[in-house]
């Protein structure tokens, strides 16, 4: 397990605080966080359509358009009508921080609290908005810094990076070769 010593952690935290924009540090609503995460899940580094967001969040398209204006004012997205929405670096950092917390919470619920695989997502959806970055990092420490959640999805690192996982097509594997899916 790779752990950061306290001195390096303090330096990293100081640097990160300077690096983060005011929008990154501000407290935002659960709804704003849900939109940022949905945009990231739909499009990652590309553009997401208003209709795809409406479907993902189970809301009406006009509601999406209204929220996109707010997100753009906050500096979280770049939105061009009829061309979709893209996260800014600030929006992407916020979305990945939320996604990291969500996936770590799912892992914790399954491994330590006896939740079933089918139950963890909904519970994590509620909890992800209430936990701090400090809590998330302590949770990662407790869990041994897992790289994937119970559903097999990769857990972003503290800096928003993803674990390096090989993507070998099944057709390229040897007959009888053992692998983990």
Predicted regions and their residues:
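Mid-protein regulatory/catalytic core that forms ligand/cofactor-binding pockets
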Residues: 8-17, 128-181
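Short alpha-helical segments that sit at the start of domains
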Residues: 15-34, 172
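N-terminal helix-turn-helix DNA-binding core of bacterial DNA-binding proteins
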Residues: 26-59
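Alpha-helical residues within the helix-turn-helix
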Residues: 55, 72-73
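Key DNA-contact positions within bacterial/archaeal DNA-binding proteins
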Residues: 62
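A short, conserved structural fragment
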Residues: 73-80
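Basic, amphipathic "hinge/linker" alpha-helix immediately C-terminal to the N-terminal HTH DNA-binding motif
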Residues: 83-102
């Amino acid at each position: 397990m790779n752990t950061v010593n306290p001195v390096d952690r303090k330096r990293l935290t100081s640097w990160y605080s300077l690096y983060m924009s005011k929008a990154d540090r501000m407290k935002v609503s659960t709804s704003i966080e849900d939109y940022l995460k949905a945009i990231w899940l739909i499009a990652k580094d590309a553009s997401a359509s208003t209709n795809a967001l409406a479907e993902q969040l189970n809301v009406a398209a006009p509601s999406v358009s209204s929220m996109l204006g707010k997100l753009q004012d906050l500096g979280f997205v770049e939105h061009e009508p009829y061309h979709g929405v893209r996260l800014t670096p600030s929006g992407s950092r916020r979305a990945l921080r939320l996604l990291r917390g969500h996936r770590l919470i799912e892992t914790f619920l399954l491994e330590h609290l006896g939740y079933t695989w089918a139950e963890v997502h909904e519970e994590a959806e509620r909890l992800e908005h209430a936990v701090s970055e400090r809590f998330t990092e302590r949770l990662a420490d407790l869990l041994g810094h897992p790289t994937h959640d119970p559903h097999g999805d990769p857990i972003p690192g503290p800096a928003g990076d993803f674990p390096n996982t090989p993507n070998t097509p099944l057709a390229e594997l040897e007959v009888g070769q053992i692998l983990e899916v």
